[in-house]
Each structure stands twice: as structure tokens, then as C-alpha cells.
């Protein structure tokens, strides 16, 4: 007997032959990447700009060390965030919480002119939020399809198009606003779009039905064998992704030292 498609009836509605939920994830990820790469585009420039230019006047070496440490932790925390989502939070709750923390983080960076501690608080919130957000939104994409669905590769291609579009727009707009108008405006714009992405996902998540909800013992016992096979395949995919992230972290740490 063919396994019933995951989620609700809404999930079975398609756009360009893909579940409509894919495009909710597409835009959520796009705005998150907008904020991430937009902030990264001006981080070192802000730190190395003179105090007269509203920067901190750091040496480039020191700024790059902070940048490297931040980037390394951004790749490390998804290992923890994926486990928390699997065991406790569920993928959707992890995505919402992670997006909220990142929106707060960008907002805190925008307040660096008031107090320098806001800057470091912002980086910390971004690291934690990314750990919850990044691995779990990708997992939801995989769960929109059966394990053997030929459309899954195309779905990830569409999803990564959102990543590229967000990165391009973030670097362009946040970079321009930060350099030409004010650094805090660049950080603030990143926060605005991250907050927008969070709201979009939060209010549209009903379209996913039961996909990505908080795990329970009851729901685990009631799953069919086909669902178990799908979950196993998804778990294997996540393990491969985490192994890749771990390799990146190791090389990033080696770069720092």
C-alpha cells in the first residue's frame, strides 16, 4: 500500500509540481540568508573603520580574528541545534526560535553605538539562533517528499536558489546602507528582514500539517513502517550534512590558530 503523503491536505497542493510548503521555506531561507550575508558584508568594514567614520578603529588582523571565530561558531552550533530539534523542540519550533534569536541579534548589533556590549551580545544571539535555524529548515524540505521522490533534488535546487538570491541582495543592500548611510542602518536592515522571515514562517507553518512538529512518544509509536523508513533516510541525510559541517568547523578552527 502506498504511503500517504506527509502532513495535511494543504501539503498536497502544488506549485510548479512541488508542495506549496517548499515556497514558504524558500522565502524564509532567502530572508535569513539576506540578513546573514548582509551583516557579514559590513562586519569587518565596521570594525576596521576609523572612529571618525563611526567604526571601532580596529586593526585588520584583530577584526579578521573575530570574524573567523564568529564564522567557526556559526558552523559548530548547528550540530547542537539539530539534536535539540530531534529530541525536544521539533523542527518548526527550532526554526521559529532560531529566527527570533537572530532577529534580536541583528537588532542588538544595530545598537552598538549606544553601548559596545550590545555588539557582542548580538553576535552571541546570532550564533545561537543560527544553530537552531540552519539545520532544521533544511530537514523540513526533505520531509515534504517521500524518500524515493524524484522531485526532491529539484526541491533542494529551488531552495538553494533562495539562498543565493538572499545572499546577493543582502550583500548589495546592507553593504550599501552600512557604508554610505551608517553601519547601524546596515545591521538594522538585516534584522528587519530576518524578523520578516520569522513572521512569514510562523504564520504559514500550518501548511506543513504534522511535518516538523514537536516529537512525542505517542506519535512515534503510531508511525507506519513506511514513515519509519522515510525518517531513517532523512536521519542519514542529516548525519551526512552534520559530518560535512564538522569538517568545515575543524578547518575553520585550524585557520584561526
Regions found by a protein language model. Name each.
Residues 97-117:
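C-terminal ends and interior cores of transmembrane alpha-helices
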Residues 1-24, 147, 175-257:
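Intracellular loop-helix junctions on the cytosolic face of multi-pass helical membrane proteins
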Residues 87-99, 149:
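Cytoplasmic membrane-interface "Motif A"-like loop-to-helix N-cap segments
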Residues 74, 151-179, 186-197:
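Glycine-rich segments within core transmembrane alpha-helices of 12-TM secondary carriers
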Residues 64-86, 134, 168:
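Central cavity-lining transmembrane alpha-helices of secondary-active solute carriers
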Residues 105, 116-133:
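Hydrophobic core of transmembrane alpha-helices in multi-pass small-molecule transporters
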Residues 132-146:
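Intracellular juxtamembrane helix-capping segments at the cytosolic ends
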Residues 41-64:
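Short amphipathic helix-loop junctions that connect adjacent transmembrane helices
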Amino acid at each position: 500500500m502506498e504511503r500517504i503523503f506527509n502532513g495535511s491536505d494543504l501539503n498536497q497542493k502544488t506549485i510548479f509540481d512541488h508542495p506549496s510548503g517548499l515556497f514558504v521555506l524558500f522565502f524564509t531561507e532567502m530572508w535569513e540568508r539576506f540578513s546573514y550575508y548582509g551583516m557579514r558584508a559590513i562586519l569587518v568594514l565596521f570594525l576596521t573603520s576609523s572612529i571618525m567614520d563611526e567604526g571601532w578603529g580596529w586593526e585588520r588582523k584583530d577584526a579578521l580574528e573575530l570574524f573567523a571565530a564568529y564564522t567557526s561558531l556559526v558552523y559548530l552550533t548547528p550540530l547542537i541545534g539539530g539534536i535539540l530539534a530531534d529530541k525536544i523542540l521539533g523542527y518548526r519550533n527550532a526554526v521559529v526560535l532560531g529566527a527570533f534569536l537572530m532577529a534580536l541579534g541583528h537588532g542588538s548589533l544595530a545598537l552598538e553605538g549606544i553601548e559596545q556590549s550590545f555588539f557582542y551580545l548580538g553576535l552571541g544571539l546570532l550564533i545561537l539562533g543560527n544553530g537552531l535555524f540552519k539545520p532544521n529548515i533544511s530537514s523540513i524540505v526533505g520531509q515534504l517528499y517521500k524518500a524515493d521522490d524524484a522531485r526532491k533534488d529539484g526541491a533542494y535546487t529551488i531552495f538553494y536558489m533562495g539562498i543565493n538570491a538572499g545572499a546577493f541582495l543582502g550583500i548589495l543592500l546592507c553593504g550599501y546602507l552600512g557604508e554610505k548611510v551608517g553601519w547601524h542602518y546596515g545591521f538594522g536592515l538585516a534584522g528587519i528582514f530576518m524578523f520578516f522571515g520569522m513572521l512569514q514562517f510562523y504564520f504559514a507553518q500550518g501548511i506543513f500539517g504534522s511535518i516538523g512538529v514537536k516529537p512525542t512518544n505517542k506519535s512515534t509509536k503510531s508511525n507506519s513502517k513506511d514513515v519509519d523508513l522515510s525518517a531513517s533516510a532523512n536521519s542519514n541525510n542529516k548525519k551526512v550534512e552534520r559530518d560535512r559541517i564538522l569538517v568545515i568547523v575543524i578547518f575553520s578552527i585550524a585557520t584561526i590558530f
